[in-house]
């Protein structure tokens, strides 16, 4: 089974969760394409990645799309979370921008949404998780990746 992401943090998490399966990265499957995330939902992007990678590999694929939706920012960055400051920004730069935008805002409610899609050429299985919380006012901790620090 292939995990359709080049994100090493996500790959580690998927391997930990599905430890009984042999999960290959895109690189290990010799797939060197980046599927454009141009859909208007997390589910749409995950489904697109799963089906596109399946067409290349002809073996089962797990794909995800995830992001944060901040209430005070009208749900932004939402489905564009990884790209809302441009393609070449780091997680630290994105986190700093979020802290800057929320600097004087009391309502710091956020939902981290993750959609997983499994596709084997016939069957589509979908899962969604939503973690609710608040954006901190400063960086905290050093473990994890992505938005874990805020």
Kindly give the residue locations of the regions a language model identified.
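Anionic-ligand binding patches
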Residues: 1-2, 8-150
